[in-house]
Regions:
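Extracytoplasmic
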Residues: 15-17, 35-37, 43-46, 61-63, ...
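A small/polar active-site loop signature that marks catalytic segments
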Residues: 151-248
Length: 248
C-alpha cells in the first residue's frame, strides 16, 4: 500500500491522470482505491480483456486461417474457373504465405487461369477503422484479407502468379487480365458453394496474441476481436457481435 501511495503522490501525478483499484478476488472487496470512479479512456488495457475472452471462448489451439479455393475444372494445365482468396483476418499473413499460395496453384499443374481471381472478404463487415478511432489516427486497415498488413492482396497475388509463369485470362475477354494488378478491390466476391480447396495457411492464437500483447499491436488486437465476433456464426461479423461475446 505504501508503494502505491508513493506512486500516486509522485511528480508524475502532477501531469497525469491516475486511477487505481486493487481488488481481492478471494475476499470480493477492494483493498486499495484512488480515483477509482474517474472516467478514463481504457486505451490498450482493453487488449488484456480481449485476450482473456479469446482464450476462454476460442481456446488455446485456435488458428487464424486463410483459404485458397477454385471453381470450375482443370483441363490439361488450364483452370476453366475462378480462384477465391478467402480471408480470415490473419494479421500475420506474409510473403511466405503468399508464396505458398502460388506454389499450391503450380503444384496442381495449372499454368493458365481462364477466369477471375476474387477476394472473399465476407468474414467481417466493411468497417475499415476500429470503433472509437478517429479517421486521422494512425490506424491499421481492418480488412480480413491482408498481406504484410496492407490491403492489396489480389494485386500482389496476381502479380506473383504472373511472375511465376501463370497466365491469367479474363474469361469474358480475349486479353490477358493484367488489369488485376490495379483492381483496388473491384474483384471482391463471396465464394460460392461447391468450391475446391487448393491450400490453406494458418497462424496460431499464441503467435497472434504474443505480438498483440507484447507490442500492443492494434491490428492484431482488432483481428482477435473479430475472431470473437466470427465465433458467434455471424457473417459478416461485426464489432457488436464481439462485444456480446466479451460481455457474456
Amino acid at each position: 500500500v505504501a508503494t502505491l501511495d508513493d506512486l500516486v503522490k509522485s511528480d508524475i501525478s502532477q501531469t497525469s491522470q491516475i486511477g487505481l483499484m486493487v481488488y481481492d478476488l478471494d475476499a470480493d472487496s477492494a483493498i486499495y482505491c484512488h480515483n477509482e470512479l474517474q472516467t478514463m479512456r481504457p486505451a490498450s488495457t482493453m487488449k488484456v480483456i480481449t485476450a482473456i475472452a479469446a482464450l476462454d471462448k476460442l481456446g488455446g489451439s485456435y488458428q487464424f486461417k486463410t483459404d485458397l479455393c477454385y471453381t470450375g475444372e482443370i483441363k490439361g494445365h488450364v483452370l476453366h474457373g475462378d480462384i477465391y482468396c478467402v480471408g480470415g483476418f490473419d494479421p500475420k499473413f506474409n510473403v511466405d504465405d503468399l508464396n505458398a499460395f502460388v506454389e499450391g496453384v503450380r503444384r496442381m499443374g495449372i499454368d493458365t487461369i481462364m477466369g477471375n481471381i476474387y477476394a472473399d472478404k465476407s468474414m467481417k463487415d466493411t468497417a475499415r477503422l476500429g470503433e472509437g478511432w478517429c479517421w486521422d489516427d494512425d490506424n491499421p486497415c481492418l480488412s480480413p484479407l491482408l498481406i504484410g498488413r496492407k490491403d492489396n492482396f489480389i494485386d500482389r497475388f496476381a502479380q506473383k502468379l504472373v511472375d511465376e509463369g501463370v497466365v491469367i485470362i479474363d474469361k469474358d475477354s480475349v486479353n490477358c487480365a493484367f488489369r488485376f494488378m490495379n483492381t483496388h478491390g473491384n474483384f471482391v466476391r463471396r465464394k460460392p458453394q461447391g468450391t475446391y480447396s487448393i491450400t490453406s495457411r494458418f497462424h496460431t492464437i499464441e503467435q497472434v496474441m504474443m505480438k498483440m500483447l507484447k507490442e500492443s499491436d492494434n491490428l492484431y488486437a482488432e483481428s482477435m476481436f473479430y475472431q470473437l465476433a466470427a465465433s458467434t456464426g455471424a457473417r459478416p461479423a461485426t464489432a457488436k457481435n464481439a462485444r456480446a461475446v466479451i460481455n457474456h
